[in-house]
Amino acid sequence: LDSANIEYIKWDMNRQLTEVGSATLPAERQRELWHRYVLGVYDLMDRLTTDYPHILLENCSGGGARFDPGMLYYSPQIWCSDDTDAIERLKIQHGTSMCYPCSAMGAHVSDCPNHTVGRNTPFKTRGHVAMVGTFGYELDVTRIPQEDRDAIPAQIEEFNKFNKLVRTGDHYRIGNMFEDNTWDAWEFVAKDKSEALFEFVQVLGRPNERSRRIKLKGLEADAYYYEENEPDKKISGAALMNAGINIAKIWNGDGLYGDFCSKILHFIKV
């Protein structure tokens, strides 16, 4: 680590601990080894962060499921899973966010076809899903389609625009892929309720499907909000939370049609 100006470390261990035993412990204490191993990892992390406090350390869920509160003491972010498919990540990130802040969830835009499931998903959808976590890119930018490469600057700009809201806002799970695997949605609301970010993913398109009406959460009921792209259309927080918004297949001229498509809406208080 002293050999160069290293600012970031990904600590990974993609292997299994099998037939674990210790020649220094008696038979009745062999099961201590797992606990002792974790204490040893904590000691290593402590020495690493003490000697190199400027380094951003990212831990990994692999190699013993080290996505735990103890690891967050040493590293502010942890890689959720090597399964980076955007649709698979909906369940992974939904469950992880039940216990851990979104700022801790390692999430990247990865290549397609996805290396885990072989699925192709739109570049935009991959970006919207990764925005829930730390956001980054897990691909070779020189080998992706030119259209996707051209979209990267705007995607990064969009992430930076909403980064603070996602990190510090209240997180609401609007959809639930565990109950209905055809769609998912979530929302981030500023602590002062001045703005809200709503994200929607249509997982599977279905024939003759009616538009969905989705109710937002956490807004100020007596205040009025407008969607960033429609500043002249004012809607009360009460209406957005009780009547909801209409999710149609064709949304404001922008096609929300087919599998794996996504949309974000940014509501701002008047």
Show the residue positions of the predicted features.
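Catalytic cores of secreted or luminal carbohydrate-active enzymes
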Residues: 124-175
